[in-house]
């Protein structure tokens, strides 16, 4: 990962680039602090649809918000009767008919911030599956709000600044209380994109003990951090979450991954009105003649700064976004109009596709105006082309629903002339998928549920998988292999260790390969290849739709490619906060059970078993146990 392996949403680099970085911005990458050492630990349980036995068995008719929230709440009470908790206000019914409700454990009125419980309620009103990381140890008897012997929030911010070497200036710092209990905004701070925040919360530490901490939020542009710093010492950092997971349009059309696969063409009104009711160049309030709309706002960002509204973007009163570009053009800024247009097109097209597959307003998608359809608005994606804060990479920041996502696309310097990452669709799709997986896992209001090592690795793998599935060609077969980032990096074989392949000779990676890996992109490459096996098993059964969007019958994609993508997306919403690969496998199986009544159980199990995630595979913090066994009742 670029920046000393610190950006949770970064694309990941070829080894040559890691060894010889060419240009970086001010940020943690230039410091000695390694955020990987502060990742939250992996502790969630997942009870899949086969294992779960509903203690709340009543069916409700009609299926109302009140009924499914009550059903989920009663389950939590039954499972952990002594726990206190609150309902997170991001529950919704997915496009597959399964309702998702999230809970946060509390103690003395304060959140236990990494103690989450997600409940999935089936269409029949019964519990479908659930997962949780609730704390089951002893809650401290003393209420910290009574004695109030913890450090103040300013001390917590200073401690965070010192521990992580953030270079924030605090000479004029002051606090402003918010409506939430022991929650503050900081004023008079420089060196951050927005005012830092602090909230008093508990955190379950890796050793299983409970610590009173200040959760300090600092957006320093290249990293958007939640730091859990001990509220008693004001110095000890117990965990860190990074939200960064670093008309007529003349473009490389959807399905063309990079300039080696086809020419640019002019495409008219490419939006899907069912997914983008305001088109791509309106936000419901204003109509634009530039690369700005409800789903995203694209611009040049040569300085790498955080301001974007006044940055340059092409403007076309007649809506003809047609600008010159050639592979030999130099310098990159000479074709910035084409770069911005391409980035805007790819991101919007992906928004529309994800919408049809279930990533809509209620699920936490990225839109300025949600048009009365639920969820929190005001969160289009900020799309920075030729961002000056780095090279040879890309990243995506995913705050909770209601705050804009931020994508940075860089220039790649491994070729002459240099190459612009915005012209490799797979990179854009990979980055946007960080927003998808972070919003769905643990619920739209919780963006820290892919922060553990294995879950963070799957976050990278989902990006590679979606990018690869989208670039499939009409003549591809089960034996077709694909690479990642090959064009931008100018590296034959791409930026992953092996191509994505169904051949164990071409790609030998299995679940137990993770025992030798401790970096999220390497872990992600294993997960992406498991999903590549799943993709082709479903295509071999159902065929492949080579069109730009799926066709449905009774809510189910009729082909294997889009069905695989749908099941992967639905699985994200079912799985617990910070899942491991075994739990994510179970969530995909459950997604198929919810969508098709398990019609693809055999194909799914065969894909996972081939890569060591068969029946009996186990996750342990120190090692993984593999299995190639397909359950006897699966096929």
Swiss-Prot record:
Q: How is the cofactor bound?
A: Binds 1 zinc ion per subunit.
- Offer one example of a GO biological process linked to this entry: proteolysis
One GO cellular component term noted in the UniProt record for this chain: extracellular region
EC code? 3.4.24.-
Cofactor dependency: Zn(2+)
* Entry-listed glycosylation sites: 287
Q: Where is this region: Disordered?
A: 290-311
Output one GO MF annotation.
metalloendopeptidase activity
Q: Does the keyword Zinc apply?
A: yes
In this entry the propeptide is located at 20-246
Give the enzyme's main class according to its UniProt record, as a single word: hydrolase
Where does it live in the cell? Secreted
**Active-site positions, per UniProt?**
431
* PROSITE patterns cross-referenced by the UniProt entry: ZINC_PROTEASE
Q: Where is the composition biased (Polar residues)?
A: 290-309
> Where does it mainly reside?
secreted
Query: Which residue pairs form cystines in this protein?
Result: none
- Could you say which residues form the signal peptide? 1-19
Which residues are listed for Zn(2+) binding in this entry? Answer: 430, 434
Annotated Pfam families = FTP, Peptidase_M36
The free-text function statement in the UniProt record for this protein reads: Secreted metalloproteinase that allows assimilation of proteinaceous substrates.
Q: Which family does it belong to?
A: Belongs to the peptidase M36 family.
Question: Under what name is this protein listed?
Answer: Extracellular metalloproteinase mep
The organism is Aspergillus flavus (strain ATCC 200026 / FGSC A1120 / IAM 13836 / NRRL 3357 / JCM 12722 / SRRC 167)
Name the lineage: Eukaryota, Fungi, Dikarya, Ascomycota, Pezizomycotina
Gene name of the record: mep
């Amino acid at each position: 990962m670029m920046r000393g392996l610190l950006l949770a949403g970064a694309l990941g680099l070829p080894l040559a680039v890691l060894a010889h970085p060419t240009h970086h911005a001010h940020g943690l990458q230039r410091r000695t602090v390694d955020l990987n050492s502060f990742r939250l630990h992996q502790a969630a349980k997942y009870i899949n649809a086969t294992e779960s036995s509903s203690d709340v068995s009543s069916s409700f008719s009609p299926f109302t918000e009140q009924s499914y929230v009550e059903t989920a709440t009663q389950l939590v009470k039954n499972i952990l009767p002594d726990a206190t908790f609150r309902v997170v206000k991001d529950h919704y019914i997915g496009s597959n008919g399964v309702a998702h409700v999230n809970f946060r454990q509390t103690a003395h009125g304060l959140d236990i911030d990494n103690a989450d419980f997600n409940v999935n309620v089936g269409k029949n009103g019964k519990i479908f599956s659930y997962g949780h990381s609730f704390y089951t140890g002893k809650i401290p008897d003393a209420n910290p709000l009574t004695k109030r012997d913890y450090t103040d929030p300013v001390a917590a911010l200073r401690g965070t600044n010192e521990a992580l070497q953030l270079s924030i200036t605090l000479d004029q710092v002051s606090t402003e209380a918010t409506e939430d209990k022991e929650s503050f905004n900081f004023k008079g701070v420089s060196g951050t994109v927005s005012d830092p925040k602090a909230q008093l919360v508990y955190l379950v530490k890796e050793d299983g003990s409970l610590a009173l901490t200040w959760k300090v939020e600092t957006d320093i542009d290249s990293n958007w951090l939640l730091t859990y710093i001990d509220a008693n010492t004001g110095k000890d950092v117990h965990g860190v979450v990074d939200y960064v997971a670093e008309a007529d349009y003349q473009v490389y059309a959807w399905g063309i991954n990079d300039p080696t696969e086809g020419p640019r063409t002019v495409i008219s009104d490419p939006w899907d009105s069912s997914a983008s009711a305001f088109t791509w160049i309106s936000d419901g309030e204003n109509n634009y003649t530039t690369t700005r709309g409800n789903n995203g706002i694209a611009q040049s960002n040569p300085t790498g700064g955080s301001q974007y509204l006044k940055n340059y973007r092409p403007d076309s009163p007649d809506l003809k976004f047609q600008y010159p570009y050639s592979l030999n053009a130099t310098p990159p800024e000479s074709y910035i109009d084409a770069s911005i247009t391409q980035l805007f097109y790819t991101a919007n097209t992906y928004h529309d596709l994800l919408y049809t597959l279930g990533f809509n307003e209620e699920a936490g998608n990225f839109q300025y105006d949600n048009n009365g359809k639920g969820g929190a608005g005001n969160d289009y994606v900020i799309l920075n082309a030729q961002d000056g804060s780095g090279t040879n990479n890309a990243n995506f920041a995913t705050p909770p629903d209601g705050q804009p996502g931020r994508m940075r696309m860089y220039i790649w310097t491994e070729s002459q002339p240099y190459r612009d990452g915005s012209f490799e669709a797979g990179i854009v799709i990979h980055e946007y998928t960080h927003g998808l997986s972070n919003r769905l896992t643990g619920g739209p209001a919780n963006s820290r549920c892919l922060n553990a090592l294995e879950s963070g690795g799957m976050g990278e793998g989902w990006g590679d998988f979606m990018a690869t599935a989208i670039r499939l060609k009409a003549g591809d077969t089960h034996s077709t292999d694909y690479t990642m980032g090959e064009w931008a990096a100018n590296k034959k074989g791409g930026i992953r260790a092996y191509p994505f392949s169904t051949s164990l000779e071409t790609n030998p990676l299995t679940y137990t390969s993770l025992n030798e890996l401790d970096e999220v992109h390497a872990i992600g490459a294993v997960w992406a290849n498991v999903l590549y096996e799943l993709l082709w098993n479903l295509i071999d059964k159902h065929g492949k739709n080579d069109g730009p969007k799926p066709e449905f019958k009774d809510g189910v994609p009729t082909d294997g490619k889009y069905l695989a993508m749908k099941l992967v997306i639905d699985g994200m919403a079912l799985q617990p906060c910070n899942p491991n690969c075994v739990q994510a496998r179970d969530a995909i199986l459950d997604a198929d059970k919810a969508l098709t009544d398990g019609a693809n159980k055999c194909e799914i199990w065969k894909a996972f078993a081939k890569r060591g995630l068969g029946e009996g595979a186990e996750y342990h913090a120190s090692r993984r146990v593999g299995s190639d066994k397909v359950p006897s009742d699966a096929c």
